[in-house]
């Protein structure tokens, strides 16, 4: 590694808080868009028999139920992962024991 790349690598540790916040917000937006895409694809395949000019009541009810179950399942998984993370010791703490 030459001196210019080592100095730029050292500068990476001091990230601008505004830039970091912007990246976090954009990452959340990307995750949300991916979730919407997955949900749309899944529910479309499940609920749409024959696309027509108007959504019939059966398809509408199916879409509503599908979206609600998708959200419930996603929330359950996130909560479960959060519980799992809380119950595991932090890596650095486990090394000091």
Curated annotation (Swiss-Prot):
Q: Which GO terms describe its molecular function?
A: identical protein binding; metal ion binding
- Between which residues do disulfide bridges form? 43-66, 47-62
Compartment(s) where it occurs, according to its Swiss-Prot or TrEMBL record: Mitochondrion inner membrane
Motif Twin CX3C motif covers 43-66
Give GO cellular component annotations, separated by semicolons.
mitochondrial inner membrane; mitochondrial intermembrane space; mitochondrial intermembrane space protein transporter complex; mitochondrion
* Biological-process GO terms, alphabetical: nervous system development; protein insertion into mitochondrial inner membrane
Q: Chief subcellular site?
A: mitochondrion
Q: What is the effect of changing residue 66 to W?
A: In MTS; disrupts the assembly of the heterohexamer with TIMM13
Q: Which Pfam families match?
A: zf-Tim10_DDP
Spell out which residues are annotated as carrying Phosphoserine.
Answer: 57, 87, 94, 96
Annotated membrane topology: Peripheral membrane protein
Listed A to Z, the keywords are: Chaperone, Deafness, Disease variant, Disulfide bond, Dystonia, Membrane, Metal-binding, Mitochondrion, Mitochondrion inner membrane, Phosphoprotein, Protein transport, Translocation, Transport, Zinc
Q: In which tissues is it expressed?
A: Highly expressed in fetal and adult brain, followed by fetal lung, liver and kidney. Also expressed in heart, placenta, lung, liver, kidney, pancreas, skeletal muscle and heart.
- Entry text on domains: The twin CX3C motif contains 4 conserved Cys residues that form 2 disulfide bonds in the mitochondrial intermembrane space. However, during the transit of TIMM8A from cytoplasm into mitochondrion, the Cys residues probably coordinate zinc, thereby preventing folding and allowing its transfer across mitochondrial outer membrane.
Q: Which disease is it linked to?
A: Mohr-Tranebjaerg syndrome: An X-linked recessive disorder characterized by postlingual sensorineural deafness with onset in early childhood, dystonia, spasticity, dysphagia, mental deterioration, paranoia and cortical blindness.
Family membership? Belongs to the small Tim family.
Question: What assembly does the database describe for this protein?
Answer: Heterohexamer; composed of 3 copies of TIMM8A and 3 copies of TIMM13, named soluble 70 kDa complex. Associates with the TIM22 complex, whose core is composed of TIMM22.
Role according to the record? Mitochondrial intermembrane chaperone that participates in the import and insertion of some multi-pass transmembrane proteins into the mitochondrial inner membrane. Also required for the transfer of beta-barrel precursors from the TOM complex to the sorting and assembly machinery (SAM complex) of the outer membrane. Acts as a chaperone-like protein that protects the hydrophobic precursors from aggregation and guide them through the mitochondrial intermembrane space.
Give the protein name, as stated in the record. Answer: Mitochondrial import inner membrane translocase subunit Tim8 A
């Amino acid at each position: 590694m030459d001196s210019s790349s080592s100095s730029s690598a050292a500068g990476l540790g001091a990230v601008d808080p505004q830039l970091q916040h912007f990246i976090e917000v954009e990452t959340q937006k990307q995750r949300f868009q991916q979730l919407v895409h997955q949900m749309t694809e899944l529910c479309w395949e499940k609920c749409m028999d024959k696309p027509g000019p108007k959504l019939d009541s059966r398809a509408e009810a199916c879409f509503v139920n599908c979206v609600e179950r998708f959200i419930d399942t996603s929330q359950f998984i996130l909560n479960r992962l959060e519980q799992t993370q809380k119950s595991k010791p932090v890596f650095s703490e486990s090394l000091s024991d």
